[in-house]
Amino acid sequence: MHPIIEIMSKKSIRFYKDHEVRAVWDEEKSTWWFSIVDIVGAITDSPNPRKYWSVLKTRLKKAGNELTTRCSQLKMAAADGKRYATDCFAQDDIIQLVRVIPSKKTEDFLDWFIYSDNTIDGQSKKKAYTLMESGLLDTLKPGTVKCLQQIHAFLFGGLYDFAGKIRTKTIAKGDTLFCLAEHLHNYLKTVESMPETTFDEIVEKYVEMNAAHPFMEGNGRSTRIWLDLILKKRLKMCVDWSKIDKREYLDAMVASHTDSTRIHELLKGALTDKIDDREIFMKGIDYSYYYEQND
């Protein structure tokens, strides 16, 4: 087994059917390393994936399988916020591991694992990481429509021909009808002029921008970054999105069209003053894109 590696330049959380899969980037080897225990839990639904992996690892060693010799231990953050040494494999070895674990989910998981980065969401998520590291966000004017358009253009440029462009068609999602296209221009001017001095004012502005839904696609991912920029500028705070359950968030956003109480509660409970913590923002991207995944 390789020695414990403590420092990695990038961290990522992927989600397979609501199962969290942690990963860290190895700059020297230009590869992602993935938590083995997370993947075992995702494809086996074992109540104790750590024990499952321990037994499997022993079995593989006894069988002379060289896979275990390529396992590295990396420091990864756990649910309690502390960092623990975690068995990890690089991508090719994860593929081999999954194929030796008996599971009906094998092919579905591999399809997700191998190809999800090539989807529009996968490509956009990479752009979001780059956006966070580029320094561009510091040049934008938080709370403005132009700021939101610039974020959207960066996230979806080259992926959608409407990246950064205000829609000219009326859209709906499920039973929710967003602002009619013919009223959108004036509606956005109204939202932009809304006050953003207090937390409650900022959340109301966010709720109204969600009701506007100014783009054909990619509204939520762009607007959550937009919200964090306002909070950072006005209150020296931001949202730790990993603290907000996906289903609760989505339900609260739907409800916010008539009653925004719950989204206020969720966002307030997830506020943090760690506005310069790179990991908070990167984790925020992971969860923001997870919110958009179909169940």
Predicted region positions:
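An anion-engaging/catalytic patch
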Residues: 2-116
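FIC/Doc superfamily catalytic core
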Residues: 12, 96-295
